[in-house]
Amino acid sequence: MRSSGYLNSNNGSSSSLESTNVNKSTDKNQLYLKVVCNCATDLVPQDTTGTGSESKKAYSSSKSINPVLVVQLNNTIKSTSKKLNTNQPSWNDELYMPLKNQDDSSLLIFSVWDKHTRYKNYLGELRLNVKDIFVDNGNFVDKTELKWYHLNSNTKYHSFVTGSILAGFELVIKNKKKRFHSSYNDKFQQLSIDSDVESAFKKWLSSLTKPTIYSVNNKINPNDQGFYDDELVNEFELESVLTERSKKSHLNVPGGNGLLSVPGDDCHDAGSFSDASFLSDGGYASDASANLFDQKETSSDSKKSRIKSKMRLRRSKQEYENFELASRQVLGVVFIEIVSCEDLPPYKNFTRTSFDMDPFVVVSFGKKTFRTGWKRHTLNPVFNERLAFELLPHESNFSIQFLVLDKDHFSFHDNVAHISLPLRTLTEYATAKPTEGDSSDVNTSDSTSFSQTGNGFTTEDTEFPENDSVQIIENETPSNKQSRKRYLSRKKVVGTQLDLKKFKAMSLSLQLHDQKYIGKYAPKLKIRVRFETYTELRKKFWRVLLEESNSTPENRDSCDYIELISLLDTLGCVNSDELVELFYSNLGKSSWGGDLLTFDEIIDQMETYVNQNVESGKVKIFEFEKCPICNEKRVSKKQDLDIITHFAICASKDWSVVGKLLSSSYVTPTQATKKWFTKALIKLTYGKYKLGGNSANILVQDRMTGIIVEEKMSVYVRLGIRLLYKGLDKARSKRVRILLKNMSIKQGKKFDAPQSKSDIASFIKFHKLDLDECEIDDPSQFATFNDFFYRKLKPGAREIEDEKNSKIVTSPADCRSVVFESIDKATQLWIKGAGFTIPKLIHNDHSMRVSSYTLGIFRLAPQDYHRFHSPVDGVIESIKHIDGEYYTVNPMAIRSELDVFGENVRTIVTIKTKDFGNIYFIAVGAMMVGSIVLTKDTGYEISKGEELGYFKFGGSTVLLLIESDKFKFDTDLVKNSSSGLETLLRVGQSIGHSPDVEEYKRDHISFDKLDKSKQLRLIRVLTGGDLKDKHKLSNWEATKIDMEDFQEIEDEEVFDKDMPDEDASIKSED
């Protein structure tokens, strides 16, 4: 083994001087920072109010603390050994951190963790500038003596930190001329200190890529509340470090003994999740020692272990990536608001001329510790800060401690007063009462607030606690004081307005720490408490979702078959069809017979299903990549995996947001234009859902105003996709194809009949259509419904942008568009059909260069103008009609395994142009489209914007194929398409241009500056209805379909010779 290697800094495994770094230094010597991690003290707060042995009683259980120290310098992360069951650990470890050329900064970070098998607790951190360690008043020193450093918390954890660490530092250079020997002493001799250390250190400082003194000092100096402002500790990286260390716990450590393996903690003993802003809760998974020189591990073994560690981390990220409905034993969630303190004793200041009291409150329960912000110079502070945490079964008998401290810059903090009492003393009188008719399990009837009977709690107003230190406050008056501190986490809400009836207000009589103030002052802590049982929270969660998804005002407390499937699909259920069928079967109702399920029935079925199946891990009912309320991802293997607890804690900050963000109907312009909400909604709508579980929600952005609105999928489209996807065998698949084809043809004939004229008025009323732009503005003058459907517009109703410039291509229709610069990008981002190819799409025209074509997809909704126009100037060279299926062109189907464009009925028009060569204009029919009609013939010289044809009733799509070396799409369309967002276009608007000319520039219009009528018209075009009245958006088309007309299909029809073979799409490509 050669001595020219580098220390391993990739994933925190035991350090070695073996060659493990790919980018080897060209210098002869490598500079290292030697960190002597000696010991720590007082890592968790202790009660010092008693005397003798009582003074050692910890507010957090110090007996279960397993401290480990993690050191991070740029990309290098290393950890010490883990010490078991001690609040005063002695590590006596030495960590070597390489100081590499072109490092980012000189910021050195220490973090202390209470590490258990299944979780970790944050105990504080320390930040130092490496330059300040060795340069004192301009004098350089290469070694420092051991020194005590006080730990602080960062703003993310916002925890009460009391610990300190004893550490020393030294700069050393590894001599590469010597080889390794077998003993540790020989290996230590390779690290030498000479005159080159100072020059090497200066060289390293000058090579830093981010050397700004201000930026480093800003990160290492706590704010006025004693918190580090930025979160610099990456939990996933630390997870990799300590997990790798845990695999090597059998190794010996210089200066210490090997660790004995201990059984992993029970999963019920894990610290439960809390999303309060002053949170110190979490979990780590490792137990290992630091081994700088590990001779037993070869370079090859080290590489393999790092690869395995990365694979484990990757699997860990995938497994714990999303919020789910977890099967856990949880009693409920406790909400406590620290309101205020009064009558605190006036501690004298340093000069003893006045009092000095900057109070704050520390709350400790089990392994969870919370801290409020401190209030300056007051004896009656008002906090209005809320915390929340889960109550696990084994914690039901635990005590909760409240400690009031005086912030002191010189002597850490002074104890002022405290109280410790069983948690059940508080929760017994603050447990939310189940609704009437269900005394054991809660079934709330209010989606955004707690609906209770009487006083809303399980105890009467005449009942009071037996503990004299706890007094119930009646007729509480709310405080009007509100503030938001800059230093707090953005999730922290201070002084929020809340319904006082939801919480039980209590006054706690505190015990003074200083005996001389007893009898003179009687400090009290005012709190508000509420305990929600887990069953009640889960049922409340069901009802919130059900009420927000209900779209029919006449059935406010019930759902039909389609609505319930749509809700489950949107939330990520992978077997919604089977689940809803099971509910109907259990209740003896017909799923397709129009029977409705009440909310109570659905909730009962949900509870039964969850209790029977989720615990066994058979199915996931919900899966959120981000929390829909706080928009935060999960960051570690904590037990915040449970969406119910996370929902309760997030919603407790502001219960009004639940209705806004869990709404499954239309999105208001104000909500949709918020970037974070749009991204979250896209993820909830499209993210990682598989076939049969895709969402019914489509986001569309208006090109002129920029507003983003949600479009609802039609019920008949959903029905068609469901039927098609559930066809398991060849005969059943063909049966469904026949059904869809018959449905489209018969519906087309129906709307061509004179009797269909009566449907025009209801269609106009439903979609709120404005006929001012039409040539015929009187609906009674249309002979049939289809005559009205493909109505013509008045001349000049659609402006052709840059009409005289033949190098500008315009939109062929009023549509929702996505565009792609290559076929490969289209198949990666949008078209997921397994058999989709361009030769198949244009029916085996092998003369075209497939890979060199751009693709534009222009989808027409039923409320759109259904005539299509030429996007270019040219001559119609050929027209080809291809018979096929009638699959829906909805994005839900396009992004499935179904090859919609390659199998649907379509007409291909080849237009020969001067600037773009031959372009392919493909009109694709869809479900409920009776036919495609062209108004121009072969040889016709057509102008840009001139009518080319129209679709009869239904949704439809136009595809454009243009050679990519002769054409570029407009940048705004490409950007939206890459994000999965459709753009609303009008006939004549520019969609792209020749590479030798500039993109057409248009003036954008502010939505707020439009008059009211234009705003409503735009919303109706985008959504297909009136945004203000979402309950009327049931579905007009669905009311016009008589399913009995399409269900009588003879078995012999399934094997009709005229029907294409099941494998026809594959054979056509040969």
Curated annotation (Swiss-Prot):
This is Phosphatidylserine decarboxylase proenzyme 2. Pfam families: C2, PS_Dcarbxylase. Residues 440-451 have a biased composition (Low complexity). Is synthesized initially as an inactive proenzyme. Formation of the active enzyme involves a self-maturation process in which the active site pyruvoyl group is generated from an internal serine residue via an autocatalytic post-translational modification. Two non-identical subunits are generated from the proenzyme in this reaction, and the pyruvate is formed at the N-terminus of the alpha chain, which is derived from the carboxyl end of the proenzyme. The record marks G955, S956 as: Cleavage (non-hydrolytic). Belongs to the phosphatidylserine decarboxylase family. PSD-B subfamily. Eukaryotic type II sub-subfamily. It comes from Candida albicans (strain SC5314 / ATCC MYA-2876) (Yeast). The gene is PSD2. One of its GO terms (molecular function) is metal ion binding. One of its GO terms (biological process) is protein autoprocessing.
